[in-house]
Amino acid sequence: ALIMWSVPAIARLLGGNPALAMWLGVANPVMYLHLIGGMHNESLMVGLVCAGLLLALRRRYVVGVALIGVAVALKATAIIAMPFVVWMLMRFIAAKWDGRRYPLAFVLAGLWVAVETMVAITVVTILSGSSWGWVSQLSGNSKVINPLAFPSLLASVATPFAIYINDDITFNQVLGWCRVICQVLMLAGLVVVWWRYRRTDQDAIK
């Protein structure tokens, strides 16, 4: 419901086609077969992130960041949205100072987002009756070897060749190297995209 409400509204604010956004972002096979059919908690995470971004576009940053913070508590990958919200909040703060002091506005926006995110995560942790032990389990997904994941594909291709060089090399070793390489590339790509789309709120959402 959150996704159905927020995705067309975001498209409308960005000057896009809400109907097309509904078909591509909501009524698609991945949504029905993976998120809904698989009963994944990503569906709630995506809904909260979309709602948070919509509220950020409407300048309701306190609630928007809080929703994304709750999404981070559900699935850590939601944190990817936060750096882009920082750009939006920075411009909002700088506008209060007649469009000046962007460096200070950037620092304040970053602190705002970081503190509110931690508060949201803390509240969710306390209300759920959990301890902070869940933080140590964030790397638990690394124990799962998904053949559809790109690092696993690279490891499957590279391992036979690596064995010719050293018989002691195992698939898990190659997979570990591939995962590190892919993580570095993904982080670098995120930084490039984050910096590239910093100029307007519309760019940040895109």
What are the roles of these predicted feature ranges?
Residues 4, 13, 137-206:
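Aromatic/glycine/proline-enriched transmembrane-helix motif characteristic
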Residues 115-140, 159:
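Transmembrane-lumen/periplasm boundary regions of multi-pass, lipid-linked membrane glycan transferases
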Residues 4-8, 12, 33, 49-58, ...:
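Hydrophobic transmembrane alpha-helices
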Residues 23-46:
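Aromatic- and kink-enriched transmembrane "portal" helix at the membrane-lumen/periplasm boundary
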Residues 44-60, 188-195:
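Specific aromatic-rich, kink-prone transmembrane helix
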